[in-house]
Amino acid sequence: MKQNIIAPRAEADISHTARATVFPDGRVRLMIADRPIFTEPGWEARERRAPRQRGAEPTAESMARAARRARRRLYDLCWANPQLEYFITLTLDAARVGDRYDLAAQGKRLTRWLDNAVRRKQLAYVIVPELHADGAIHWHGLVSAGGLHFRDSGTLIRPEGGAPMMPRSAAEYADLIEAGAHRVYNLADWRFGFSTAVRLYGQREAALSYVSKYITKAQASGLGHIGGRWYLHGGKLAEPTVYTYDLAYDEAPDGAYEHIISQIGARCKIYDYYPDRESGEILEG
């Protein structure tokens, strides 16, 4: 639904207490809030304040609101595309890009490489910048394997998690792999700096939350946008479908868990499920 700028609607008419996000694999995430906080798709709130002067900086409130929208969209986009199965970290060497601290210059170089990988290697990706303590910029995201080449770095992540470690011997390496350790790869196609890649393991939801949190970090650190965007994405990516309607908070299904949206002080119950396509039975997930 496209926004009708000729006949705007009152906020009360387009705000609802429930939102269902339906993913291509049939999974549904139902969210029920204690008040109407979900806006119908295609509508945006009209600014009640005086319009921002040309060239003026956006307010902290508008930046936070934009970051929340971007984080939610990033999360949903990643959920809708299970082929995004590798978590990667990339850096750009100063000798290649000229300035490790210049977001625009890095974004331009990275985007060019990503575009080539989409065309030549059928890459699909979602990538977010992160500002490190020293001011340098790293890039984190999820990518499809596509035609990329992964080279074993020799380091592992222990079965219980933690930072990558280098086994002291081939025997220890083999023992850790047998115990369920996870290989850390380097991206052989990436020649502009450092890279790591780890195939996702464990709960996918935790990995997606980990990726989307970088938008919050970027907004808090004042890192800014890449050409007006909070994150980069490309390749063949499926989109979820969003529906809004009204349900009472206590109508949430059994098994829903409560979540506090701290930015707006709203309570929300979340329920994830898969409707069985043949029987119609609801399968929790």
Feature names for model-found ranges:
Residues 1-135, 145-285:
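Right-hand nucleic-acid polymerase module
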Residues 140-143:
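Short beta-strand->loop micro-motif that forms the acidic, two-metal-ion catalytic signature
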